[in-house]
Structure formats: C-alpha cells, structure tokens
C-alpha cells in the first residue's frame, strides 16, 4: 500500500510539474524529502522561489483534493520550506521571496487547478 501511494504521489507530481513547465515555471526539485517533511515540487518564476504542494485524487466521491490542504498542512509545508531555506542559504539568497502554491488534480474529470501564493 505504501508503495502504491508513493507511485500515485509521483504521478501527481509529474502531472503538476508538466502543467507548471507549460506556464513558464522552472522546476528546481521534485519530491524533496527531509526529516521535517516532504516538499512535492520546488519551482521558480519571476525570481520567486515557490514550494508546491500537490494533491491528487482519482475521484471526488469522498471530497476534493482542495479539502486535503488545510491550515495544518500549510503550516507543515511552510515549516519544511523554512528549514529547506535555512539548510540551503545559497539558494535562499538568490530569490526575492518565497511562497507556497498548490496543484490539485482529479483524474476522473481530468481537472487540474493551480492555486498561487496560499496563506493561512
């Protein structure tokens, strides 16, 4: 089951990366795992470093992918992003600022939505 979840997660990250590339984003890293958490995608556009949370659901029968990104999830992504920046000062100093985005995907309806600069 764990391996299947990883495979599904990778599929979602790949779909999100493709969408963002088409929108002019540069992909710096994918599936960056640390002891503080995982950053699905790290991308850049207009000198902004962006940490992207990706949520993929096969259907919306039991809720939307957006419902999976609440206050606690955003706080975890923010903390992981801050630790990433502390541990990568050369990367951190290259950019004007950073933000958190999300890409939500529903396979059944082929819906893929990019939410920019999330706050909580």
Question: Whereabouts are the PLM-identified features?
Answer:
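Domain-level recognition of nuclease-like catalytic cores that cleave nucleotide substrates
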Residues: 87-120
């Amino acid at each position: 089951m764990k391996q299947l979840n990883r495979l599904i997660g990778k599929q979602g990250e790949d779909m999100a990366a493709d969408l963002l590339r088409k929108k002019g984003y540069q992909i710096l890293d994918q599936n960056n795992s640390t002891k503080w958490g995982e950053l699905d995608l790290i991308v850049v556009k207009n000198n902004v470093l962006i940490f992207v949370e990706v949520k993929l659901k096969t259907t919306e029968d039991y809720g939307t992918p957006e419902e999976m990104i609440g206050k606690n999830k955003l706080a975890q992504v923010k903390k992981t992003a801050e630790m990433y920046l502390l541990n990568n000062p050369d990367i951190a100093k290259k950019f004007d600022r950073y933000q958190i985005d999300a890409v939500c995907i529903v396979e059944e309806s082929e819906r893929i939505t990019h939410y920019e600069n999330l706050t909580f």
